[in-house]
C-alpha cells in the first residue's frame, strides 16, 4: 500500500502473498486443463500474428504482380488448402508474367493449363482457360519478362506460401487442442462457429466457470453497455465499455459476420441482428449488440452443458 512505486523481488513476494491470503477461499488447484488453455491462447495470439504477416505478404505479392500480370489475383477465389497453398498463388508462380500466357496460342495455353491443373490437383475448366487467355491479350505489363523479374515474384510467392502454411498448421493444431476441452462439442454446435472460430473463442474466453454471471463475461469481452449516471442524471445511450479483451471482440465480430453471410433464420442471434439492422442501427451498434447476445447464450449453454457432465470430467 506504499505510495512509492517499488519493483523488487521482496515487493513482488509481498504482493503475491497478500493476493493469496485475500483469495484463499476462491483459488483452485492448477490442473493440466489450465495448461492446455494457456497453450491454446498462446497459439491464438501466434495465429493472429501470422495472419497479419500473411496479409502483408499477400498485398506485397499483388503489388508486384500488378506490374507484370495485373488482376491475376482475382482469377480464382478458392480457399487455402490444408498445406496453405492457394490456386491463384500457384498460378501466379507458374504464369508470373502476362507474356507467359499470351505468347502461346489459345490451344497451346489451354493444353498447358490443363496439365498444370492436373499436376497441382486443381479443377480444370476450358471456359476459364479461354477467359484467362482473352484477358491476357488486353493487359499491358510494366516490368519486362526476364530472370530478375521472375526472381522477385518467386521470392514474394515463397514468403506468402510460408506464412500461409504456418497459419494453416496453427489452425489445425488449435482445433486439435480445443477438442480436448469438455465444452468443445456444445461450442461447435453454435451457429457462426466452425473449426477455426470455435477454438479462437475458447482460447480467448477460457474457463467459463470462473465467471459468476452473464454480465461478467460480457464485461470481460468489453461488449457490455457503459454507464454514465450522477445524482438525478442518467445518460440513456452510452457507448460500450471496450475495457475487455480486444482479441475476443475481434473474434466475436467475425462470428457475427459469418451469421450475417450464412443467414440461419432460426438462430436467435441472427434474428436479433436482423431486428437491429431493420431499425436502422449503425454497423458497430448492431454488431456489438449481437456479440453481447451471443456471449450470453454461449455462457448459458456451456455452463449448463458442463454442469450435466460427471464430476470426474
Predicted regions and their residues:
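A detector of single, family-specific signature residues
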Residues: 1-313
